């Protein structure tokens, strides 16, 4: 057991360390939620990760994205994520994929016999395309719903997609996947009604939503923890709505 894994091993044992090292994860989105999910996965010792994100860091990311620094502004998120992972665990098998998630790329994104999909993207159309393909393959999926417009970390919940409530993004995803078997999709979402504040639009016309660093961090680390529990063979919130 490596020195890096010593404290984890005291909790999960040598067999747990082996399971984590042999596990493989596709992570879509390396932003506010995905960056923290990556941090948890890498530090837990997940052996193989594919990071998918077509975006680059901007100054507006600095308030909430753990991978965003003044030095990474303007750089591709997927590449920065891989550099961060290797700085923690040089032996990790990690691959950047700087592509947009859509109908034309989801098959490639999920290719390669991965164990788990961790979904941290927030565009409805892209999310539905990804989760539809994931449901077809049956890959174990842990998906973040809307983390923006929330203040209360104690309202974060875990549930199967079909049992989510309150969250508008979850409602849109449920509607978009109503003809799919979503039994392999477990969600992290908030039961706090979204805060009603004015929203802006970016240069592409996409809504810009207010967000703290704290709520996305809880979402991301919860996604990582669900993945870790699944790899270790521990129940990951399939049965119904569960508070953290």
Model region roles, listed by residue range:
Residues 46-89:
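Glycine-rich phosphate-binding loop and adjoining beta1-alpha1-beta2 segment
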Residues 27-29, 52:
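Conserved N-terminal Rossmann-fold NAD(P)-binding element of oxidoreductases
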Residues 110-116, 121-129, 136, 141, ...:
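Glycine-rich phosphate/adenylate-binding loop
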Residues 33-34:
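Hydrophobic/small residue at the entry helix of a nucleotide-binding pocket
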Residues 42-48, 136:
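Conserved S-adenosyl-L-methionine
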Residues 98-106:
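Conserved SAM/SAH-binding loop
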Residues 1-26:
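N-terminal charged helix/coil linker that caps or initiates catalytic domains
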């Amino acid at each position: 057991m490596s020195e890096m894994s010593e404290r984890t091993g005291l909790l999960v044992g040598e067999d747990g360390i082996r399971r984590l090292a042999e596990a493989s994860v596709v992570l879509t989105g390396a932003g506010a939620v995905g960056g923290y999910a990556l941090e948890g996965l890498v530090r837990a010792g997940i052996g193989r990760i594919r990071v998918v994100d077509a975006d680059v860091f901007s100054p507006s990311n600095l308030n909430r994205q753990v991978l965003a620094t003044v030095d990474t502004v303007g750089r591709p998120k997927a590449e920065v994520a891989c550099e961060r992972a290797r700085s923690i665990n040089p032996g990790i098998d990690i691959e950047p994929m700087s592509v947009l998630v859509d109908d034309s790329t989801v098959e490639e994104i999920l290719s390669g016999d991965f164990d788990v999909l961790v979904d941290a993207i927030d565009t409805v159309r892209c999310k539905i395309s990804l989760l539809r393909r994931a449901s077809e393959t049956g890959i174990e999926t842990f998906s973040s719903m809307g983390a923006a417009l929330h203040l209360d970390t104690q309202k974060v919940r875990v549930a199967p997609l079909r049992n989510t409530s309150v969250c508008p993004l979850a409602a849109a995803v449920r509607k978009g996947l109503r003809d799919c078997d979503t039994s392999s999709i477990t969600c992290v979402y908030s039961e706090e009604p979204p805060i009603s504040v004015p929203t802006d639009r970016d240069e592409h016309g996409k809504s810009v939503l207010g967000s703290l660093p704290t709520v996305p961090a809880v979402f991301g680390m919860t996604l990582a923890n669900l993945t870790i529990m699944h790899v270790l063979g521990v129940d990951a919130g399939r049965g119904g709505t569960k508070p953290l």
